[in-house]
């Protein structure tokens, strides 16, 4: 009986930490469903990179998505944040991304984006300068850290 009682708190702790979990596949589906729901425009949208992590320190994951806006002769990227406020993950905010995004990660609540930027002699097609941008999710906004 003692062994059973000792295991119960650990089991309950494991269950409580799983209640807020979202898998990578679920996050990618949420991102894909979101871009599919956007109204038709002169651009098309594509969720190109998706990461999951706690951005605000509340112990619950947020979903961060690199969304590509693809126009007829141009493209740009933005950072979309999805938050679960008890009714499933919903789009909560966006910020602009710079350059040709290579990777996105979350490190201690900060979104770290590695991009290629054009150097002084680079043709428009082929940026060569490595640049790292950092963003914080604060007050419902994506804020670029300087």
Task: Report the location of each language-model feature.
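Acidic, small-residue rich beta-repeat scaffolds with periodic aromatic anchors
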Residues: 4-5, 18-40, 102-146
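Bacterial N-terminal signal peptides
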Residues: 6-16
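A short beta-strand motif characteristic of beta-propeller blades
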Residues: 37-41, 90-93
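Hydrophobic/aromatic beta-strand elements that line small-molecule binding cavities or substrate pockets
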Residues: 49-51, 79-82, 101-103, 132-135
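Acidic/hydrophobic-patterned starts of short beta strands in beta-sheet-rich repeat architectures
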Residues: 57-68, 109-116
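Structural motif
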Residues: 72-80, 121-127
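Beta-propeller fold detector
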Residues: 91-98, 144-146
